[in-house]
């Protein structure tokens, strides 16, 4: 067999011409240590703060520490099979999560992946988990209410759209119950809800999702979950992911409500990450930037003006204000509100609802302490009728608490003091409310009107609950148009006052409670 040199050279030329060289430049490094979800990488010279790092097995880590000759990163997801010597590379991207209306009614994890078994998400794109909060000029003052459906909250500690109102209290005082009822009450208000569960048991979250579904509120809600069994990195990032999903609605001229349950567990997860990254510990072993951890999150809850919305949507949405209202939850230890994280969040937010163990155990639920609970901006957002009728409630309770303390030592009390004590007891009883039973503005207004105008004076303390139930059943049956008018307008004038007085007079005559 004879070899033809010409043919061979032609064949080689063809093969060389067909050879496709695609060069890809990437910044590659090597894992030098793995410990509790934190990896140290050598060789990523151009890595940026907060950049996603691609790991073997289609996983990612986020770069948090940029040091002279190494990078400290937290792994998002399982890390047991990661080992020294493995190759990793920079992606040039920061963490993004899916956003859009298709997420409503779904349960997702921190990275936006569905975990409810209902198939893939129908999303409108991706949004960065870290975003700069709107500036002062882009904001609008808070002047529209968010009704929680709780008499004690909507009357004394009103919440406005775009406000940050802290729910604070010891464990088992009804913090989550208050937040879940606030979500249930938004079924027909048009406010979209995001519930972020951080460091909770999967069984607890499953129960919350079931309750939302039972009460028809899940279709209006996105549930973001980072359970206690998940890595500290996912628990730390969950609130930012939920906030990005809420900002989608805010920036398009809609209203959204986000609940962080709870930020104490997020701070603990961040402390764990920081200590593993060898950052210097400060008070209570928290890192120095734990204030910034919460402030950069909560400042993103805001009411933005129409110009901001128009600029963001490139003119598609005009004349609409958007808002993101935040209800962060903080768990205290033995009622200590002066601990590090509680004081930080109190100073960041626009008020707090303080839930007390003693009140809860005494059967006063919601266990709101009106003495140290406050809403700094919500008063401007209250409806006219609620503002008018709720003024005397806080005063009556404050006087009652003061007199109750003195009456323990005094044996003979004058009639005026006895009346005040009796009125205070009845108002306290009236503000009690069952879980999953939010009340409309009209129902609350009627009940507050009865307390304000002395209609409870001759009702026995033990009958206050049945008096309220019978009164609400009576108006729903015979005076539904007036209730609808109050719910729609929230107005208060002499005519409405006269009608409310007439309803209560005719109801008292029936003695049906």
From Swiss-Prot:
<dbReference type="GO" id="GO:0043531">
    <property type="term" value="F:ADP binding"/>
</dbReference>
<keyword id="KW-0813">Transport</keyword>
<dbReference type="Pfam" id="PF00006">
    <property type="entry name" value="ATP-synt_ab"/>
</dbReference>
<dbReference type="InterPro" id="IPR038376">
    <property type="entry name" value="ATP_synth_asu_C_sf"/>
</dbReference>
<keyword id="KW-1003">Cell membrane</keyword>
<dbReference type="GO" id="GO:0005886">
    <property type="term" value="C:plasma membrane"/>
</dbReference>
<dbReference type="Pfam" id="PF02874">
    <property type="entry name" value="ATP-synt_ab_N"/>
</dbReference>
<keyword id="KW-0406">Ion transport</keyword>
<comment type="similarity">
    <text>Belongs to the ATPase alpha/beta chains family.</text>
</comment>
<feature type="site" description="Required for activity">
    <location>
        <position position="373"/>
    </location>
</feature>
<dbReference type="Pfam" id="PF00306">
    <property type="entry name" value="ATP-synt_ab_C"/>
</dbReference>
<keyword id="KW-0375">Hydrogen ion transport</keyword>
<dbReference type="InterPro" id="IPR027417">
    <property type="entry name" value="P-loop_NTPase"/>
</dbReference>
<feature type="binding site">
    <location>
        <begin position="169"/>
        <end position="176"/>
    </location>
    <ligand>
        <name>ATP</name>
    </ligand>
</feature>
<keyword id="KW-0997">Cell inner membrane</keyword>
<dbReference type="InterPro" id="IPR023366">
    <property type="entry name" value="ATP_synth_asu-like_sf"/>
</dbReference>
<keyword id="KW-0472">Membrane</keyword>
<dbReference type="InterPro" id="IPR020003">
    <property type="entry name" value="ATPase_a/bsu_AS"/>
</dbReference>
<comment type="function">
    <text>Produces ATP from ADP in the presence of a proton gradient across the membrane. The alpha chain is a regulatory subunit.</text>
</comment>
<comment type="subunit">
    <text>F-type ATPases have 2 components, CF(1) - the catalytic core - and CF(0) - the membrane proton channel. CF(1) has five subunits: alpha(3), beta(3), gamma(1), delta(1), epsilon(1). CF(0) has three main subunits: a(1), b(2) and c(9-12). The alpha and beta chains form an alternating ring which encloses part of the gamma chain. CF(1) is attached to CF(0) by a central stalk formed by the gamma and epsilon chains, while a peripheral stalk is formed by the delta and b chains.</text>
</comment>
<dbReference type="InterPro" id="IPR036121">
    <property type="entry name" value="ATPase_F1/V1/A1_a/bsu_N_sf"/>
</dbReference>
<keyword id="KW-0067">ATP-binding</keyword>
<protein>
    <recommendedName>
        <fullName>ATP synthase subunit alpha</fullName>
        <ecNumber>7.1.2.2</ecNumber>
    </recommendedName>
</protein>
<dbReference type="InterPro" id="IPR005294">
    <property type="entry name" value="ATP_synth_F1_asu"/>
</dbReference>
<keyword id="KW-1278">Translocase</keyword>
<keyword id="KW-0547">Nucleotide-binding</keyword>
<keyword id="KW-0139">CF(1)</keyword>
<dbReference type="InterPro" id="IPR033732">
    <property type="entry name" value="ATP_synth_F1_a_nt-bd_dom"/>
</dbReference>
<dbReference type="GO" id="GO:0005524">
    <property type="term" value="F:ATP binding"/>
</dbReference>
<dbReference type="GO" id="GO:0045259">
    <property type="term" value="C:proton-transporting ATP synthase complex"/>
</dbReference>
<dbReference type="GO" id="GO:0046933">
    <property type="term" value="F:proton-transporting ATP synthase activity, rotational mechanism"/>
</dbReference>
<keyword id="KW-0066">ATP synthesis</keyword>
<dbReference type="InterPro" id="IPR000194">
    <property type="entry name" value="ATPase_F1/V1/A1_a/bsu_nucl-bd"/>
</dbReference>
<dbReference type="InterPro" id="IPR000793">
    <property type="entry name" value="ATP_synth_asu_C"/>
</dbReference>
<dbReference type="InterPro" id="IPR004100">
    <property type="entry name" value="ATPase_F1/V1/A1_a/bsu_N"/>
</dbReference>
């Amino acid at each position: 067999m004879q070899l033809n040199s010409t043919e061979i050279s032609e064949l080689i030329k063809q093969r060389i011409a067909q050879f496709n060289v695609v060069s890809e430049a990437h910044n590659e490094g090597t894992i030098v240590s793995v410990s509790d979800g934190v990896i140290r990488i050598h060789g990523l010279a151009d890595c940026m703060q907060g950049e996603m790092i691609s790991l073997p097995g289609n996983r990612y880590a986020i770069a948090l520490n940029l040091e002279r000759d190494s990078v400290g990163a937290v792994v998002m997801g399982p890390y047991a099979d990661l080992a020294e010597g493995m190759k990793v590379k920079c992606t040039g991207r920061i963490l993004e999560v899916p956003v859009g209306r298709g997420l409503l009614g779904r349960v997702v994890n921190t990275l936006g992946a569905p975990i409810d078994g209902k198939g893939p998400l129908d999303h409108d794109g991706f949004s960065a988990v870290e975003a700069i909060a709107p500036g002062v000029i882009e904001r609008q003052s808070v002047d529209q209410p968010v009704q929680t459906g709780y008499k004690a909250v909507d009357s004394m500690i009103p919440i406005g759209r775009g406000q940050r109102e802290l729910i604070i209290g010891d464990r088992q005082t009804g913090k989550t119950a208050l937040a879940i009822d606030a979500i249930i009450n938004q079924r027909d208000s048009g406010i979209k809800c995001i519930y972020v569960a951080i460091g909770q048991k999967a069984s607890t979250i499953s129960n919350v999702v079931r309750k939302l579904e039972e009460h028809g509120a899940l279709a209006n809600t996105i549930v973001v979950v980072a359970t206690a069994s998940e890595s500290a990195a996912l628990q730390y990032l969950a609130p930012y992911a939920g906030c990005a999903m809420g900002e989608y609605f805010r920036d398009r001229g809609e209203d959204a409500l986000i609940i962080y349950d709870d930020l104490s567990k997020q701070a603990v997860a961040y402390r764990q990450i920081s200590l593993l990254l060898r950052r210097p510990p400060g008070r209570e072993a928290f890192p120095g930037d734990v204030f910034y951890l919460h402030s950069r999150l909560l400042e993103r809850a805001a009411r933005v003006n129409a110009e901001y919305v128009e600029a963001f949507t490139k003119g598609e949405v005009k004349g609409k204000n958007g808002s993101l209202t935040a209800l962060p939850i903080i768990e205290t230890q033995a009622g200590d509100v002066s601990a590090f994280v509680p004081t930080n969040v109190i100073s960041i937010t626009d008020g707090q609802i303080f839930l007390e163990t003693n009140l809860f155990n005494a059967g006063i639920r919601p266990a709101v302490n009106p003495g140290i609970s406050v809403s700094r901006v919500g008063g401007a957002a209250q409806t006219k009728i609620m503002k008018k009728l709720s003024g005397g409630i806080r005063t009556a309770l404050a006087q009652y608490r003061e007199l109750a303390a003195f009456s323990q030592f005094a044996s003979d009390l004058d009639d005026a003091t006895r009346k005040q004590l009796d009125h205070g007891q009845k108002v306290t009883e009236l503000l009690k409310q069952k879980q999953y039973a939010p009340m409309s503005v009209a129902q609350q207004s009627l009940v507050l009107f009865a307390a304000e105008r002395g209609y409870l004076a001759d009702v026995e303390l033990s009958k206050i609950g049945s008096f309220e139930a019978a009164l609400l059943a009576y108006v729903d049956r015979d005076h539904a148009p007036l209730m609808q008018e109050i719910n729609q307008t929230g107005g208060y004038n002499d005519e409405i006052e006269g009608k409310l007085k007439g309803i209560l007079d005719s109801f008292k005559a029936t003695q049906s409670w």
